[in-house]
């Protein structure tokens, strides 16, 4: 499961989505998550699913890659869905026992929560798969630039976010190596009760933390060796530019919002 984590990786390509400005993709991603909460019925969610599938198709990356990105988080999603089903009340009651209630409203809300999680993960994965870490850092710094007036270290925050995203697949790969080494020594991560399984997982974290600190120190040394002193006065080799495609993307998001409002109120 660990090696299937896609979030944080970049896949080179020449698709329309790859060609969009990183700021456009980042702002559109936040906007997409915001308007997703406007969806409140089957028609609105059908529109969002159709739009998301179209975006995935435009990336030139196979859909199964994005599905792999959802799989590592499926248990968290299902747990949230079950909580919605058991504790949301309203509509026709199918089962009622103590604090637990299964109703038509709870089932419907559970399906919508599942779709919402999956769509957010897929759209977030679209951004990271089609945007280089450097462009993503510059986009975050640009968006946070107004906070620089308040003496907020915008460039440092952008760098930390970018490094964190970049290190997700690296740390997951490191975890996978440690788990394989433990299995080679006879450790079985699937046996025993919950307490025993948690006890088996503990030895993974110590070498993982050591490896993480070592990688962080190596990265800091490499940045210092290249003369990095923060974002102040730093020049950039690649300058982000708005293009006509970014204007088209903004218009598409406006049309998507209008469609959601119409389907929501109809």
Swiss-Prot record:
The keyword Transport applies. Pfam families: CbiQ. The gene is ecfT1. It is found in: Cell membrane. It comes from Listeria monocytogenes serotype 1/2a (strain 08-5578). Forms a stable energy-coupling factor (ECF) transporter complex composed of 2 membrane-embedded substrate-binding proteins (S component), 2 ATP-binding proteins (A component) and 2 transmembrane proteins (T component). May be able to interact with more than 1 S component at a time. It is a multi-pass membrane protein. GO terms for cellular component: plasma membrane. Belongs to the energy-coupling factor EcfT family. This is Energy-coupling factor transporter transmembrane protein EcfT 1.
